[in-house]
UniProtKB/Swiss-Prot annotation:
This is Photosystem I assembly protein Ycf3. It is a peripheral membrane protein. The lineage of its organism: Bacteria, Bacillati, Cyanobacteriota, Cyanophyceae, Nostocales. Keywords: Membrane, Photosynthesis, Repeat, Thylakoid, TPR repeat. It is found in: Cellular thylakoid membrane. The gene is ycf3.
Length: 173
């Protein structure tokens, strides 16, 4: 059964109806519309915690979607799933692919930084301060890029950059 037929709450039903109306009136080709349906169903499954199902929908959307920006969002959402399941290496791979296709994704840059920071913490806990600091430096680089794109976001990252001496004066202005 298509995911769109499973939506049983008012908000999901409303979103589905509106998305279907927009799909019908948008001047786009059938393949792009079909890709969006899979993407929408992937988001719905992801929101319900049905990660395996969401990944299937996203994979199908990737095979159909030709727009690089949209492909970037699909890869980003797939990265979210892998990160939430603890597969940080796969999440990093997908976030990097997303940024290659759509460089205006500060949320992907932030998530890369979060993973590098987490890995840095783990290295330091294991007693490898040098590896931990190297990962912190990588996290800082990605947070700086994210903050430059969205200066009103990532306040905790901005504070971390300042308190660790990794901020650059022009980052915040």
């Amino acid at each position: 059964m298509p995911r769109t037929q499973k939506n049983d709450n008012f908000v999901d039903k409303s979103f589905t109806v509106m998305a279907d109306i927009i799909l019908k009136i948008l001047p786009t080709n059938k393949k792009a519309k079909e890709a969006f349906v899979y993407y929408r169903d992937g988001m719905s499954a992801q929101a319900e915690g049905e990660y395996a199902e969401a990944l299937e929908y996203y994979e199908e959307a990737l095979t159909l979607e030709e727009d690089t920006n949209d492909r970037g969002y699909i890869l980003y959402n797939m990265g979210l799933i892998y990160a939430s399941n603890g597969d940080h290496n796969k999440a990093l791979e997908l976030y990097h692919q997303a940024i290659e296709l759509n460089p205006r994704l500060p949320q992907a840059l932030n998530n890369i930084a979060v993973i590098y920071h987490y890995q840095g913490e783990k290295e330091k806990e294991a007693g490898d301060n040098e590896a931990g600091e190297a990962l912190f430096d990588q996290a800082a680089d990605y947070w700086i890029r994210a903050i430059r794109m969205a200066p009103n976001n990532y306040i905790e990252a901005q504070n971390w950059l300042k308190t660790t001496g990794r901020s650059q004066i022009d980052v915040f202005f």
